[in-house]
Swiss-Prot record:
<dbReference type="InterPro" id="IPR009080">
    <property type="entry name" value="tRNAsynth_Ia_anticodon-bd"/>
</dbReference>
<feature type="short sequence motif" description="'HIGH' region">
    <location>
        <begin position="18"/>
        <end position="28"/>
    </location>
</feature>
<dbReference type="GO" id="GO:0005737">
    <property type="term" value="C:cytoplasm"/>
</dbReference>
<dbReference type="InterPro" id="IPR033911">
    <property type="entry name" value="MetRS_core"/>
</dbReference>
<feature type="binding site">
    <location>
        <position position="136"/>
    </location>
    <ligand>
        <name>Zn(2+)</name>
    </ligand>
</feature>
<keyword id="KW-0963">Cytoplasm</keyword>
<dbReference type="GO" id="GO:0006431">
    <property type="term" value="P:methionyl-tRNA aminoacylation"/>
</dbReference>
<dbReference type="InterPro" id="IPR041872">
    <property type="entry name" value="Anticodon_Met"/>
</dbReference>
<feature type="binding site">
    <location>
        <position position="151"/>
    </location>
    <ligand>
        <name>Zn(2+)</name>
    </ligand>
</feature>
<dbReference type="InterPro" id="IPR015413">
    <property type="entry name" value="Methionyl/Leucyl_tRNA_Synth"/>
</dbReference>
<dbReference type="Pfam" id="PF09334">
    <property type="entry name" value="tRNA-synt_1g"/>
</dbReference>
<comment type="similarity">
    <text>Belongs to the class-I aminoacyl-tRNA synthetase family. MetG type 2A subfamily.</text>
</comment>
<protein>
    <recommendedName>
        <fullName>Methionine--tRNA ligase</fullName>
        <ecNumber>6.1.1.10</ecNumber>
    </recommendedName>
</protein>
<keyword id="KW-0648">Protein biosynthesis</keyword>
<keyword id="KW-0479">Metal-binding</keyword>
<keyword id="KW-0030">Aminoacyl-tRNA synthetase</keyword>
<dbReference type="InterPro" id="IPR023457">
    <property type="entry name" value="Met-tRNA_synth_2"/>
</dbReference>
Length: 530
């Protein structure tokens, strides 16, 4: 297969394909919000972006969940999948492809890929003995287990002993190739802590892994031995490839891999790191395909410092959270307050405090009061000042000049908290600047040029902040842009706002038709039960 060199102008990224044994939880929402922010940022840079999400629908866990409700597995999946799609709509996620592992065209891709790996001599039949976690859909090594034969991830679940004939993938064959790849591509696994985990795991010696199950009806049959069902992970990882097909394409690897492959970024939770950073690249090497650019494993979420779980009754309902506070609020808190890659905590009191402080007070009040001053102090509700009138040593201009480059660097390494933090520094400096300069006092002294200079400088800084935060808070950013006289909606993909222009300080012109001041984020009143 001749794969063309992927264009610099394209960027493909994936969330995990979420397991549909239940409705989506806040952890799934977290990964997807991050992916959407990356996708929106890449679009600002002028790239064609493909954001892939979807659902992993095969396996024993789903079969058992369906049986417990007296339903067929497909019926069960068909009822759960819409809850993911509706949550993504609520969160303002602009995904391009939703890949379901039960899709007919996915089976064609899986069968073709299996045939390639079979022809490479990397699949054989053997006896599988070991402890199996149904929730992980994975065999566990004895040294990994907790007391009472419990899974280290699903601590309330006992693993099951299995002894059965399975097909295996020769993972051990790729030990050296993988180690050499990790060495020559140090950014492949991120952050550094995850990379070290993988290097440590691989250095202990890779074992061949089972890619089929017997006594399991729910999944694709092994192409040359239908008594066996393909292991959920062998099938699920390939759904990233299936998602690359255009709707009218015949489902072949050649068609799928033509434009978007290799994937630029796989975003995952750290619990599925091994599958994406070890098994997946080895499978691709076996099939003779280029490897993805980057796998980023983020941390887990806790609530009020405690691990979340249904048994503890302390889960965070993402649907309820968005319905109560709005999508921008939820996106902002999780991306700004948690260092992506580390574990993070949700606390509703802190959540409300952060939103009120950053969005309602610092950003919202600043825009509102400044626009009202323009209305009060400037003829025809317009500024006569332009960027050329502002000296380079102006406090806010000096801060704004390099801000775009700093924020770009932060977004590119998925440091959303840093991107938000440096933008907020400009907003806070703008609040201090307007208080220090006191345009109301300058107006009384009839120093009109200075009044307008102060107001221009602050409004331009708010504009720049809105633009740079638009991947995180697109609704609020759109509202700000429209109040500043730009007919731009950051949710409309046809509205072109090139980074090279809009990330520069000084874009606001003296011809702007400023909009009416409106609150961009209403202060949240804290109820007693929070």
């Amino acid at each position: 297969m001749n794969l063309v060199n992927k264009a610099e102008k394209t960027f493909a990224l994936t969330t995990p394909l979420y397991y549909v044994n239940d409705v989506p939880h806040i952890g799934s929402a977290y990964t997807t919000m991050a992916a959407d922010a990356v996708a929106r940022f890449q679009k600002l840079l002028g790239r064609d972006v493909l954001l892939i999400t979807g659902t992993d629908e095969h396996g024993q866990k789903i079969q058992r969940s369906a049986e417990s409700l007296g339903k067929a597995p497909q019926e069960f999946c068909d009822e759960i999948v819409p809850s993911f799609m509706s949550l993504w709509r609520l969160l303002n996620i602009q995904y391009d492809r939703f890949s379901r592992t039960t899709a007919v065209r996915h089976k064609a891709i899986v069968d073709e890929f299996f045939a390639r790996v079979w022809e490479a001599g990397d699949i054989y039949q053997g006896q599988q003995k070991g402890w199996y976690c149904v929730s992980c859909e994975e065999f566990k090594e004895e040294r990994e287990l907790l007391e009472g034969n419990r899974c280290p991830i699903h601590v309330n679940k006992e693993v099951e002993w299995r002894d059965e004939q399975n097909y295996f993938f020769r993972l051990s064959k790729y030990q050296t190739q993988l180690e050499e790849f990790y060495q020559s591509h140090p950014d492949f696994i991120q952050p550094e802590s995850r990379r070290n985990e993988v290097l440590n795991f691989v250095s202990q010696g890779l074992q061949d892994f089972s890619i089929s199950r017997v006594n399991l009806d729910w999944g694709f049959p092994v192409p040359n031995d239908p008594k066996h069902t393909l292991y959920v992970w062998f099938d699920a990882l390939l759904a990233y490839v299936t998602a690359l097909l255009d709707p009218e394409d015949e489902p072949t690897l050649e068609n799928a891999l033509g434009k978007w492959w290799p994937i630029n970024l796989h975003l995952i939770g750290k619990d599925i790191l091994r599958f994406h950073a070890v098994y997946w690249p080895a499978m691709l090497l076996s099939a003779g395909l280029p490897l993805p650019d980057r796998v980023f494993g983020h941390g887990f979420l806790t609530k009020d410092g405690q691990k979340m779980g249904k048994s503890l009754g302390n889960t965070v309902d993402p649907v309820g959270l968005v319905q109560q506070y709005g999508s921008d609020a939820v996106r902002y808190y999780f991306l700004k307050e948690i260092e992506f890659g580390k574990d993070g905590d949700f606390n509703e009191v802190r959540f409300i405090h952060v939103l009120n402080a950053d969005l309602a007070n610092d950003l919202g009040n600043l825009l509102n009061r400044t626009l009202n001053m323009v209305k009060k102090y400037c003829a025809n509700y317009a500024l006569s000042i332009t960027n050329e009138d502002i000296p380079a040593e102006n406090t806010l201009k000096a801060l704004g000049v390099d801000l775009g480059a700093k924020v770009k660097q932060a977004y590119e390494v998925l440091a959303f908290n840093q991107a938000c933090g440096v933008v907020l520094s400009l907003v806070q400096a703008s609040n201090k600047f307007i208080d220090d300069q006191a345009p109301w006092s300058l107006y009384k002294q009839e120093r009109q040029q200075e009044v307008e200079t102060v107001l221009y400088t602050v409004l331009e800084s708010v504009r720049l902040a809105a633009y740079l935060l638009s991947p995180v808070i697109p609704n609020i950013s759109s509202n700000i842009y429209q109040q500043l006289g730009f007919g731009i909606n950051f949710n409309e993909q046809t509205d072109i706002t090139p980074f090279a222009i809009h990330a520069q300080w000084g874009l606001l012109s003296n011809k702007q038709q400023l909009g009416q001041p409106q609150p961009i984020f209403k202060r949240i009143e804290q109820t007693k039960n929070v």
